[in-house]
């Protein structure tokens, strides 16, 4: 996202999503002009991060929701370590299998970001990690079923 796009989008959106690469500066307790501009909007901000944001000065800021993410297309399940997932509000999926977001949900993630495609045969950057509508429906069904487990 570009800083000038914030002004363009602001009247039409309820929240902004910051990709992992653009959010890294916050983990060093610094921020970019893009982050500052988005925070100034006072809208909810969702930020993907591979590293726990727990020690970030913005960690408890009500306006920000944090998603755990491995910034790789595709991400192999063996690369996922959900050990710190509870430091995050959710999970941004880059795995081609539905098991990763399902597990994140079962571990308490309140926000799940998945990529969706209309056509798996197309060649897009994220199409190899995108779910078609049938897979998305299966994922949602499994999540709803898992919510019936006693806690």
Residues covered by each model-derived region:
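Catalytic cores and adjacent flexible loops of soluble metabolic enzymes
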Residues: 1-151
């Amino acid at each position: 996202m570009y800083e000038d796009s914030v002004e363009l989008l602001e009247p039409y959106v309820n929240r902004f999503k910051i990709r992992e690469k653009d959010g890294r500066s916050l983990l060093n307790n610094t921020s970019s002009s893009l982050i500052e501009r988005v925070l100034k909007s006072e809208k909810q901000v969702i930020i993907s991060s591979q590293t726990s944001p727990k020690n970030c000065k913005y960690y408890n800021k009500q306006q920000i929701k944090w998603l755990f993410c491995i910034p790789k297309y595709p991400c192999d399940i063996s690369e996922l370590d959900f050990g710190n997932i509870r430091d995050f509000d959710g999970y941004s999926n880059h795995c081609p299998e539905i098991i990763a977001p399902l597990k994140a949900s079962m571990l308490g993630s309140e926000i799940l970001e998945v990529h969706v495609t209309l056509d798996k045969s197309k060649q897009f950057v994220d199409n190899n990690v995108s779910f078609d509508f049938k897979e998305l429906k299966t994922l949602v069904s499994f999540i709803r079923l898992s919510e019936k487990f006693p806690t």
